[in-house]
């Protein structure tokens, strides 16, 4: 199954908008560490992994992902690891043509940038309040 990648130039993405859809292989945590094919859907805030038609999807939310590490390129596969905030490593591989690693990395960067922009006004407000003089006639150390 070929992956379908849809990258839009819109600055605001909804969490339901599908950015990429297709097949990805996940290495199992079992003793033999076999590669299992998963149907995957990438949105602006998560990666959904489907094992079968009836089982519910496992979701990796971007707020719990620290980074995506590209481990190895071969002629057939790209091996990469998703590292969670708790430093759990989840190994994946995809065909070179599918570019899943790049799609997930770009979506994660976009998510982190949107989150930083949302937090910026709050940070700026907290910073300006901490720099205000405590008494009306008092000047800050940086003032004239």
Swiss-Prot record:
Ranges where the PH domain occurs: 18-111
GO molecular function: phosphatidylinositol phosphate binding
Keywords, comma-separated and alphabetical: Cytoplasm, Membrane, Phosphoprotein
Subcellular location(s) of the protein: Cytoplasm; Membrane
Membrane topology, from the record: Peripheral membrane protein
GO cellular component entries: cytoplasm; membrane
Entry-linked SMART domains: PH
Miscellaneous notes: The Phlda2 locus is imprinted. Loss of imprinting results in overexpression, leading to placental growth retardation phenotypes.
Name of this chain's protein: Pleckstrin homology-like domain family A member 2
Gene for this chain: Phlda2
